[in-house]
Amino acid sequence: MKLNIKQSLFGAALMAVGVSAQAETITLKVEHFLGPQTIQHTTMLGEWCKNIERDSKGRLNCQIYHSMQLGGKPPQLFDQVKDGIADVGWTVAGYSGTRFARLQVFELPFMMTNAEATSRALWTYAEKYATEEFKDVKMLAVHVHGPGQIFTREAPITKLEDFKGKKLRGPTKQVTDLLKDLGATPVGMPVPAVPEALSKGVIDGAVIPYEVAPGLKVNELTKFTSEPDPSFNALYTTVFVMPMNKAKYESLPADLKAVIDKNSGLEYSAFMGKTQAGADAPAKKVFQATAGHTIT
């Protein structure tokens, strides 16, 4: 009888430990370089976090760190994820130099049709041709933004000759090479540095999509928006990556890995591209409503 009681108590204790372990909440540290009011923070990353919490029945959740709150500069974000400082990150592929060289084909002029379709194509391409570039992380999504625009301080760009001598900010090597070929003097910098560079006259303008521009006060810091001909594909776009720390992913039980997998990949990449590009139209209205700003 005593043995049976001990066995029962031991079994109950094991069950309690199992239930406790199963019910443990795992909080993922998610980091990006933009502000807390941006669509990247509230929707693109925010929805992903809501979805994994829902699908895991609360066993997974997120703490989103905006504006590089975990330290460092935007070009360091990918390595922060690889090294475990952050569990998940969202960043521009080109901020890591030539680390994602195979993805840069999607930043070539006139490659992008619309951000949703191009993001689907980018994920499919990356799975087939860029696995070596992602070997140190678990890649959750790759995507592009909507058509890039040209914002300038003093004069619009309406013809090829107008590029000559203008110091224009570009996000990645592919885009700065394009600006150089057009006759401009390219200045590479992460997008958070654009407002100060414009206000101090370090640059004459910047190429960025509409959606991020009002949050950077580009409508106030520039006088002109030059829109590339919409009858063509986009003049340029930028590739974004969303990596997860590989060790963190591998430490999850199988059912939670399945939750991450369900909310990542082709469809999530398409969602990211569609959502970011969908913010272009309301952002353009901010420029249209800004006194003294002209769209050509």
Region roles according to the model:
Residues 126:
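Thiamine diphosphate
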Residues 24-117, 129-296:
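N-terminal secretory/targeting leader peptides
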Residues 11-17:
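Bacterial N-terminal signal peptides
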Residues 13, 118-123:
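Short, Φ-rich (hydrophobic/aromatic) sequence segments
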Residues 1-10:
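Bacterial N-terminal signal peptides that target proteins for export
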Residues 17-23:
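Sec/Tat signal peptide C-region and signal peptidase I cleavage site
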